[in-house]
Amino acid sequence: MEYLSDKFSLKSPAIKGSDYYMDQVMDTLDNVQYYNKASPKCVQAFPMQSNDQHSSMDRSSPCDNQSSVTYCAPKSEESSLHAMENCCSLRVSPATSGPDKTDLDELGEKCDSNVSSSKKRRHRTTFTSAQLEELEKVFQKTHYPDVYVREQLAMRTELTEARVQVWFQNRRAKWRKRERYGQIQQAKSHFAATYDISMLPRTDSYSQISNNLWTGPSAGSSVVSSCMIPRGSPPCVTSPYPHSPRAAEHGYVGFPNHQQNQFGVNHVSLNNFFADSLLASSANSHAAFETKPEFERRSSSIAVLRMKAKEHTANISWAM
């Protein structure tokens, strides 16, 4: 009661004992809104303002007349309601109005642009032909220029020292990559050439040479070259057919022939040398010759008959 007496003090003590005093206190308690968690924030923000207005109105208004009391209570209610409307309008207005919404969108876009601009962007430098020429000249001299050289080069090319340093780093990386690639290609070509020669298909040249030697009419020659046989060797060693006239005709060492042509002897001896050197280096060819004795005898007999026929025709033509 002391709080109420201090808050709602009246001018005359006689009015305190009347019934009107208690009615006035109850009305003020009903109009005052206390703090409550369930009440909205806008109502909580303006309770003291309504109380102050109500108390000031009570103090200023005369309490002798009852009409003044009825006038005071609606005034406080209207002020509190007006404060609530102002609060709610402040809270609802940004969402409902169109221009305010566009302003908020613009602010959001600006914030996003500021965030994106804060990120570090990498700019690609485009060099001119003159700048590249200057840089390449220095790179041919040294791959690792010092700070002084980089600064001088930056002044000549109108670039920053950092750009020049980055260019040299990229150029060194490119040079190392090319060197590595060149070494790999060189190794590949070397091994490819080595293995390609070894993997070539081998033709059966020895069998063809042996067949041409034994079956051809003009291919009758010794198996062993005359250049590789000593002069003192017997006729059985120098020629496989010591009793045939072909040995004398081709000019073996054991059977010299004075009537032979010089050019024919040279031609036949060279052919015999190359053919016999190939045959002598192959063991398979010797095995082939040893396993076909009947074929050799037949070919030798045919060759002897042909040579006899040639000699007969030559003698007839000479006699005529």
UniProtKB/Swiss-Prot annotation:
Subcellular location: Nucleus
CDD domains assigned to the protein according to its UniProt record, in alphabetical order: homeodomain
One GO MF term: DNA-binding transcription activator activity, RNA polymerase II-specific
GO cellular component, as recorded: nucleus
Keywords of this entry: Activator, Developmental protein, DNA-binding, Homeobox, Nucleus, Repressor, Transcription, Transcription regulation
DNA-binding region: 120-179
Disulfide bonds: none
A GO BP annotation: negative regulation of DNA-templated transcription
Main location: nucleus
Keyword Nucleus listed: yes
Keyword hit for Transmembrane helix: no
Motif (OAR) on chain: 300-313
Region of interest (Transactivation domain), ranges: 180-320
Phenotype of the disrupted gene, per the record: Morpholino-mediated knockdown causes severe craniofacial alterations including small, misshapen head, microphthalmia and loss of the jaw. It is associated with a more or less severe loss of the cartilaginous facial skeleton. Pericardial edema is also detected.
Family, similarity comment: Belongs to the paired homeobox family.
Function in brief: Sequence-specific DNA-binding transcription factor that binds palindromic sequences within promoters and may activate or repress the transcription of a subset of genes. Most probably regulates the expression of genes involved in the development of mesenchyme-derived craniofacial structures. Required for proper neural crest cell migration into the frontonasal primordia during development.
Domain notes: The OAR motif may negatively regulate DNA-binding and therefore transcriptional activity. It is found in the C-terminal transactivation domain that stimulates transcription.
Assembly description: Binds DNA as a homodimer; required for transcriptional activation.
Protein name: ALX homeobox protein 1
Organism, scientific name: Danio rerio (Zebrafish)
Gene: alx1
